[in-house]
Amino acid sequence: MTHPLAEKFAKTFGAQPDLMAQAPGRVNLIGEHIDYSQGFVLPFAIDLYTSVAIRKRNDGIVRIASSQRNQNFETFEVSEIKPGYGTGWAKYPLGVLWALEISEGLDIFIDGKVPSGAGLSSSAALECSLAFAINELFHLGRSLKDLALLSQKAENDYVGVPCGIMDQSISLMGKSGFALLIDCSDLSTTLVPLDLTRADLQLLIIDTGVHHALVDGGYAERRASCESAAAKIGVASMRQLSAALLENNQKNLTNSEF
């Protein structure tokens, strides 16, 4: 039986994919606005995924389609891929191709089950599933840590979102039944058992109705406040900040920085 994703790919592009991959969204248990301050975070992967199917082309053309956009593809020139090229949602997969320095054409079909704008890292799931697939298809030999950093680079430098490294790390390195303790100063990780069923517990993910947008939301402002506060206090990042040091410098900080 043909995989449903392969069927969608074939219907859109007229051929079977060379390779398929998927990566999950995530929930963070603790550590908000900490990853870009080099602190500790404790996310875990969820059972909602973004899947990709890809196929090599020999003409330097990149065609990208999504089941969330009526399976119609957009066409790009691989030689033109650099920050500023492409618009909207297509900048995410284009950014991954740019970060991984891909110079060959591709057909890419994306099937996302992670709700967009829900704070579950749909963008990281897209980036990581595609980065993993490209790494396998082109035999790049990149580690999962490398792929996380390259996916973050795509979002930071191509899409223009100053996200930290947490979302990409858990999407690529998460494991069922575990949370992942990430030290964002060096990306060292520790699997932490999270067997909720055995403890007779359930963790609820509730839709608050508030749309989460990293590109035009308050995320960039919050990160800028953290970085400017650290600079004023004289530390490399907020991770190095003690409660006493923060209190002693309150008069030098704006309300948002404090």
Regions found by a protein language model. Give the residues of each.
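Gly/Ser-rich oxyanion-binding loop with an adjacent helix/lid
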Residues: 1-19, 28, 37-40, 73, ...
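C-terminal nucleotide
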Residues: 1-26, 51-86, 181-258
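N-terminal cofactor/phosphate-binding cores enriched in small/glycine residues
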Residues: 31-33, 46
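Short Gly/aromatic-enriched secondary-structure transition segments
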Residues: 38-45, 222-223
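Short, charge-rich binding segments
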Residues: 43-45, 53-56, 101
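A short, structural micro-pattern
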Residues: 46-48, 173-176, 197-200
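A generic structural motif
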Residues: 47-49, 59, 115, 177
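Residues at beta-strand starts and edge strands
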Residues: 48, 104, 108, 200-202
